[in-house]
């Protein structure tokens, strides 16, 4: 019987696109490697910055070297690149730092996988080798971790070193000591709770970064109303989200026709009485400070002033939420049952000047660990980048307070893990050993890139570092000030164990997900149907 020759059958809708086998894999590798190459120049203490310009009517300018910020603000179309962008975002949310490292490591793993597949090694063999390598690297990292949680002095020094290491690759590196102290003091005030919501960051143009300071209280970037007390002691605070602008008819957009101006005056009087009644209900709570998320119009403001109550309007939602947290109050919208409303409290509310701006200062708040970091700087871009840098440091410190284990930075941990994986590969038979060796090579690329970004001879430095670890000097790492190999324990270049562990596991998982892909199917775009029913 003659064999049937079938033409290829397209099972997808018109407009759908499919990439298969090698084409799909190559497309994934190229996209992921391109993302890694984009951010790798920002890695390390001598990393470079990127300028991000957004288009459109409200075009904004951003100068940053934060991996997560760069990847979040660029639009990517490649599916593998999107996987790495999402991974860096998760790294930022989980531990706050290591966003560039995790992206670069995943990209380097895929670069190695590309050359292994070219040598006809099956993706599943590579994955099996990588899984064993990840396990060995994690165990090596765990065995090198140091825990000073029980020693207060050493733990404080660890926190200072970790904050310093995190900030050394940021814009704040020139004021590292100042901001390290600020960040550590702010996190230690949390008393182990790790609730970063209690740390409020305010940015004010003017002065220099060195003028930034930590304020032991809460600052709200608003002004106190006219003819109202500017200072209140032992404050009882009602925090609300309610309309205080009932000076116009707002009943389902209704219209009112009147036959004389006297009728208009009657309507206005009724509106005023309605507002007066609402203010009286608020005052029944026994408060001396009223903070509203929405506007407070002139008439209710006068009523509050006459009652000797400080009224603060238009406190943005994030400000109100945080204020409720630190003063121990709850946000209210109705005022019929004063006994059910939880009021906030603080010892003193007063108006203060920062630069040319007036702010409201709350001191002696119910949440004792609450504080505000006031950032000063010459331009808005500097302030924004300083805030991002400080956020990374605060997140890492909060993570370290929960899990006090630390490891050494400067490429030391990566080289330690690479050495453990290489030793495992030498004991493993078959093709999996080649995959393990490629994993070790990808880990060694991180110190290589750090040295390259600093303008040093990376091949020579990494060879020296590899030799040092082979000789058993497990605290050896890159000293980027001197351009040589140094002892990280002496130099105080310390990183959080959780950050390093998350970088290793996230990068390995993301690279494995992309390596498993052998088909990319793009759905057909939705057809636009002409609208035959215009408004």
UniProtKB/Swiss-Prot annotation:
**Looking at the Swiss-Prot or TrEMBL record, what is one Pfam family this protein matches?**
Cpn60_TCP1
Q: Keyword Chaperone on this protein?
A: yes
Q: Which domain of life is it from?
A: Eukaryota
Question: What residues bear Phosphoserine in this entry?
Answer: 3, 60, 260
Q: Which residues bind Mg(2+)?
A: 97
Q: N-acetylalanine modification sites?
A: 2
Catalysed reaction, written as an equation = ATP + H2O = ADP + phosphate + H(+)
N6-acetyllysine PTM sites in chain numbering: 13, 154, 181
- Binding-site list for ADP: 44, 98-101, 168-169, 410, 495, 500
Q: Name one GO cellular component term.
A: zona pellucida receptor complex
Where in the cell does this protein reside? Cytoplasm
Q: Which UniProt keywords apply?
A: Acetylation, ATP-binding, Chaperone, Cytoplasm, Hydrolase, Isopeptide bond, Magnesium, Metal-binding, Nucleotide-binding, Phosphoprotein, Ubl conjugation
Q: Which GO terms describe its biological process?
A: binding of sperm to zona pellucida; chaperone mediated protein folding independent of cofactor; chaperone-mediated protein complex assembly; chaperone-mediated protein folding; positive regulation of telomerase RNA localization to Cajal body; positive regulation of telomere maintenance via telomerase; protein folding; protein stabilization
Query: What's this protein's function?
Result: Component of the chaperonin-containing T-complex (TRiC), a molecular chaperone complex that assists the folding of actin, tubulin and other proteins upon ATP hydrolysis. The TRiC complex mediates the folding of WRAP53/TCAB1, thereby regulating telomere maintenance. As part of the TRiC complex may play a role in the assembly of BBSome, a complex involved in ciliogenesis regulating transports vesicles to the cilia.
Q: What class of enzyme is it?
A: hydrolase
Identify this protein by name.
T-complex protein 1 subunit beta
Q: Which family does it belong to?
A: Belongs to the TCP-1 chaperonin family.
Task: Enumerate the NCBIfam families for this protein.
Answer: chap_CCT_beta, thermosome_beta
CDD domains assigned to the protein according to its UniProt record, in alphabetical order: TCP1_beta
- In the record, which positions carry Phosphothreonine? 261
């Amino acid at each position: 019987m003659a064999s049937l020759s079938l033409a290829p059958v397209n099972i997808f809708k018109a407009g759908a696109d499919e990439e298969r086998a090698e084409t799909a894999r190559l497309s994934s590798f190229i996209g992921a490697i391109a993302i890694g190459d984009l951010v790798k120049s920002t890695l390390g203490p001598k990393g470079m910055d990127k300028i991000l310009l957004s288009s459109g009517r409200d075009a904004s300018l951003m100068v940053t070297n934060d991996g997560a910020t760069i990847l979040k603000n660029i639009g990517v179309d490649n599916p593998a690149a999107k996987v790495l962008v999402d991974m860096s975002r998760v790294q930022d949310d989980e531990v706050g730092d290591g966003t560039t490292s995790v992206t670069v490591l995943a990209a380097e793993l895929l670069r190695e996988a590309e050359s292994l597949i070219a040598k006809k090694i099956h993706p599943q063999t590579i994955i099996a080798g990588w899984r064993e390598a990840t396990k060995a690297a994690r165990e090596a990292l765990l065995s090198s971790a140091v825990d000073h949680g029980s020693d207060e002095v050493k733990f404080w020094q660890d926190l200072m070193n970790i904050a310093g290491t995190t900030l050394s690759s940021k814009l704040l590196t020139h004021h590292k000591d100042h901001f390290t102290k600020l960040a550590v003091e702010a996190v230690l005030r949390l008393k182990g709770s790790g609730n970063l919501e209690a740390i409020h960051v305010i940015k004010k143009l003017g002065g220099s970064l060195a003028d930034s300071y930590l304020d032991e209280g809460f600052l709200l970037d608003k002004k106190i109303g006219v003819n109202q007390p500017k200072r209140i002691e032992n404050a009882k605070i009602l925090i609300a989200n309610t309309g205080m602008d009932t000076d116009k008819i707002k009943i389902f957009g209704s219209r009112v026709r009147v036959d004389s101006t006297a009728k208009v005056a009657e309507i206005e009087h009724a509106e005023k009485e309605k507002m007066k009644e609402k203010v009286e209900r608020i005052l029944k709570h026994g408060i001396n400070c009223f903070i509203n998320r929405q506007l407070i119009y002139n008439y209710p403001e006068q009523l509050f002033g006459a009652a000797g109550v400080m009224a603060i309007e238009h406190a943005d939602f994030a400000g109100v939420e945080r204020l409720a947290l630190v003063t121990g109050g709850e946000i209210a919208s109705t005022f019929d049952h004063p006994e059910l409303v939880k009021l906030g409290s603080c010892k003193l509310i007063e108006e203060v000047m920062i630069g040319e701006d007036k702010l409201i200062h709350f001191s002696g708040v119910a949440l004792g660990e609450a504080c505000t970091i006031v950032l000063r700087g010459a331009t808005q871009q500097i302030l924004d980048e300083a805030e991002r840098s400080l956020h990374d440091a605060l997140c890492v410190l909060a993570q370290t307070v929960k899990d006090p284990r630390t490891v050494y930075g400067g490429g030391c941990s990566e080289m330690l893990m690479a050495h453990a994986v290489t030793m495992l590969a030498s004991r493993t038979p078959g093709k999996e050993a080649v995959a393990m060796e490629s994993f070790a090579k990808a880990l060694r690329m991180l110190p290589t890139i750090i040295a390259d970004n600093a303008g040093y001879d990376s091949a020579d430095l990494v060879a020296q570092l590899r030799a040092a670890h082979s000789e058993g000097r497990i605290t050896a790492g890159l000293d980027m000030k001197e351009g040589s190999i140094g002892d990280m324990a002496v130099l105080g270049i310390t990183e959080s164990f959780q950050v390093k562990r998350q970088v290793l596991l996230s990068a390995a998982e993301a690279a494995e997900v992309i390596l498993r892909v052998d088909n990319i199917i793009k759905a057909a775009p939705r057809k636009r149907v002409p609208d035959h029913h215009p408004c």
